[in-house]
Structure formats: structure tokens, C-alpha cells
Regions:
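Conserved donor-binding loops in enzymes that form glycosidic bonds
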Residues: 9, 34, 159
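Short beta->alpha junction loops
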Residues: 31-38
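Catalytic nucleophile-elbow at a beta strand-turn-alpha helix junction centered on a G-D-S/GDSL motif
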Residues: 2-17, 38, 68
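Alpha-helical cap/lid subdomain in secreted, periplasmic
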Residues: 2, 22-28, 43-181
Length: 181
């Protein structure tokens, strides 16, 4: 049975149980109980997670919402150029495991959310896609699954997935992973 490692922020934490339920009879699905937060945090913690979970066959990973978050109301936590450099380093570490790596784009916020700007989220996603293309890593375009449906798929906190969003995004992840099993 192939081992799938799910890494990412709280959006990943939203859909991970759905993915586990759908794939547990076809693959060993493992995931950090910890929020992988922003790219620099993932880069720092990745060696420990790989040690804990062992070598995966497949990694489905995302970072970006924390990086694009305006915690102080002024600027994103991580400048997009730094975000891209950190993703590059994470990509290299993940590829060195021999796993098939899939990067998931960040999902949008509801437009009325003052802490995120969807134009910026798209800018971060474009930077991420460029890094992944350069590294031969497939991209799961989760932004597109939610875009246009933010009111239907996101909670009242304006950023996290609700039940319907978990099903839609979770199924998009299952579909990509199923093709690799």
C-alpha cells in the first residue's frame, strides 16, 4: 500500500479527514496534526515530519495562506519573492525523498475578509506554480475549486472550509491522489 503524506495549513487540516476516509482502503494516509503554517515554518519542520512519518510515496502539500496573510493589516507576512525561495527549498527536500510530489494552490478568502486579498493570493499561487513547474512538480489547482463559490464553501470566519467546501476540495484532492495509486 502506498503511503500518502498530506502537508499544509488549516485548509489541509479541514480536508485531511475526508481524504483519509475516501482513501484509507487504498493507501496509508498520514498527516501532521500540526498546522504547517507558512512556508518558512514548513521548511524548518519538514525534516522532523519526514522522520516521524517515514519516506512517503506521494506528498500532497500546500503553503501560502499564512504567507499572504496581513496579520498587522499592512503587508503580507512573507514577501512573495521570499515565499518562492522557501517553496523552492521545500520542493527540493520533498523531491529528494523520491516521492511523487503534488503542490496545491491556496484557496481564496471570502471577498469581505480584511486580512486576505484574493488578488494577492493569486499572485502567491502564480509564484508557486512557477516554482513547481521549474521542479517538475504537479499542481492541484484548489484555488479554482473554491473561486466563485466562496459564500457556499467557506465558513463564517471567511477563510476556512465549511462542510460543503470540505467535500468539494477534499474530493479534488482525492481525485488527484487516486490517479497515482
Amino acid at each position: 500500500m502506498k503511503k500518502i503524506l498530506l502537508l499544509g495549513d488549516s485548509i489541509r487540516m479541514n480536508y485531511a479527514p475526508y481524504v483519509y476516509r475516501k482513501l484509507c482502503d487504498k493507501a496509508q494516509v498520514v498527516t501532521s496534526e500540526e498546522n504547517c503554517r507558512f512556508a518558512k515554518y514548513t521548511l524548518h519542520e519538514l525534516p522532523a515530519w519526514l522522520k516521524t512519518f517515514g519516506t512517503p510515496d506521494i506528498v500532497h502539500w500546500n503553503n501560502g495562506l499564512w504567507d499572504a496573510h496581513h496579520f498587522d493589516g499592512v503587508a503580507p507576512l512573507t514577501p512573495v519573492a521570499d515565499y518562492a525561495k522557501e517553496l523552492e527549498r521545500i520542493a527540493r527536500l520533498l523531491k529528494a525523498t523520491g516521492a511523487t510530489v503534488i503542490f496545491a494552490t491556496s484557496t481564496p478568502a471570502r471577498p469581505e475578509n480584511p486580512e486576505w486579498d484574493n488578488g494577492e493570493i493569486q499572485e502567491y499561487n502564480r509564484a508557486a506554480v512557477t516554482v513547481m513547474e521549474r521542479n517538475g512538480i504537479a499542481v492541484n489547482p484548489l484555488y479554482g475549486v473554491v473561486a466563485g463559490h466562496e459564500g457556499e464553501y467557506l465558513c463564517d470566519d471567511l477563510i476556512h472550509l465549511n462542510r460543503e467546501g470540505i467535500q468539494k476540495v477534499g474530493q479534488a484532492v482525492v481525485d488527484v491522489l487516486s490517479n497515482l495509486l
